Amino acid sequence: QSNVGIPDADDSNIGGKTQIVGSKIFVYYPGDLNEFRTQIRKGIAEVLVGQMLFGDNWREMIKNNALISFPTWFTKGLTNYAAQPWDVDIDDRLRDLIGRDKYSNFNRLKGDNVEIAGQSVWYYIAETYGSNVIPNILYMSRVTRSIESGFLFVLGISLETLMKDAQEYFEFRYETDEYGAQEFVDFDPIRTKRSADYSEPKVSDDGRYLTYASNQMSKTKVFIYDYVKNKRKRYLRQGHKLDRLNDQSYPIMDWNPVTGELHVITEKKGKLWMTRIDPEKGKVSKIELLRLEKVMEMDFSPDGKQILFSAINKGQSDIYLYSIAANSQKQLTNDIYDDRYPAFWKGNSILFASNRANDTVNLANNYLEFAPLESKDIYQLDLNDDEVAFNLTQTPTYDEKSPAAYNDEKYIYLGDESGIRNRYIGRIDSSILSIDTAITYRYFSKNEPLTAYFRNLREFDFNRNEKKIAELFLLDGRFKFMSKEGNEVVDEYVP
């Protein structure tokens, strides 16, 4: 049994979800300031929307709630829009709904799909009529006790016409995006459930295995797929299917390139555990990770002796270098910025994504002078000189994440510059800055897109030794895996 997610339980919460009790909101820092900010905005918006529709005292609430019932897409869609009007992830989920012809009837949608469809309607209204009409729609809906009348009096069109107009708007938009887009190659023959979410695709060092995690109503499973035998096997299972808020932050996984073992990080009763799994023998051992509150990403060193963690401790997300032999970690960054997706690169340098506004990695007490940015760039940090990080992408209006080393000169990562998350490649170059008693060089990076899919590339994992990549997409209502090898990994798509 569990009381997590029950509205009356105001003493617990899951990251990424906002609990509302009366006029109180309960939020939890998920390791990303943008997500945290969205939680706060959504909580405030839900309180304000509730007061606008039902009144701000209990008598009005009881009276109005008995006289009118607002559909989920109307209320939840509006609070989601107020918290985050639009982003590439919402766009991708809506693109999938419209592609499956599920958008025309909101009453048949369930779960998050209802909220996404509702949010798209409010987004369309704001883009077409202006966001100033939204409070008027709420007021007229409350006064007339009818959402149909609210839209008709303010917009001058019926709700049915509004729905058709919104659908045509997005259909035209997505048809334009698909023109000239890169087609998918054959997907891996891995069965996935429509009712489950999938994450953490990781290719083993020898290129034979692909591991991934499934999450169905908080019941998580870890699978290992054998490319050679075309078979998969479940190795870990945790949790139970419960109708509650779904925590999708675990498990976190990566392969040890030397031993060939899979390391899986899970959370149980407030403690972090790292389990070693041999694909042939099964579970080997389990140890507790100390002095960390939450681990979000991990990456093994080439010698298999160290692990990079992006982890939360004392309310901030930083990069840690973990020693397997000593079961202890060294903190590499210490500031208010979100430092995510660490990866080993050439020599003693690492890659990571961050929303930092300053290249100094130890600004523990400077909370106001250098405010975090709303998007992340890819950074390089030399472990021998770990005071300054070098910005590799420098795109303040676009978001990048999940860097991975391609070789000693190049790196690949995910970016949303086109409005759809695709894979990019970058390399560091140099030019002569001045010639005096010695030549001074200026270092910079060059970045260009590798893929042009019309759907978000949600996650990927690259095997540097075998030049093999596994990609994860949401297509036709279910998650699908696609693997590539050799030159296909870095061949630039030209329409």
Where are these regions (language model features)?
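Conserved beta-strand position repeated across blades of beta-propeller domains
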Residues: K202, D254-N256, D299, A343, ...
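Active-site-proximal alpha-helical
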Residues: F70-I90, D96-G156
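Blade-edge beta-strand/turn elements of extracellular beta-propeller
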Residues: Q182-P189, N327-L332, D386-T395, Y443-E448
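Juxtacatalytic substrate-recognition/specificity segment
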Residues: Q1-N64, P71, V88-D89, G150
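A flexible loop/linker signature enriched in serine peptidases of the S9 family
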Residues: D92, D96, R194-S195, A213-F223, ...
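Pro/Ala/Gly-rich low-complexity, hydrophilic intrinsically disordered segments
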Residues: L159-S204, N230-R234, S354, R427-P449, ...
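Short coil/turn segments that connect the beta-strands within blades of beta-propeller domains
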Residues: D206-R208, V258-G260, D303-K305, G347-N348, ...
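Beta/coil-rich, acidic/histidine-enriched accessory regions frequently appended to metallopeptidases
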Residues: V143-R244, Q248-M253, T259-E261, P279
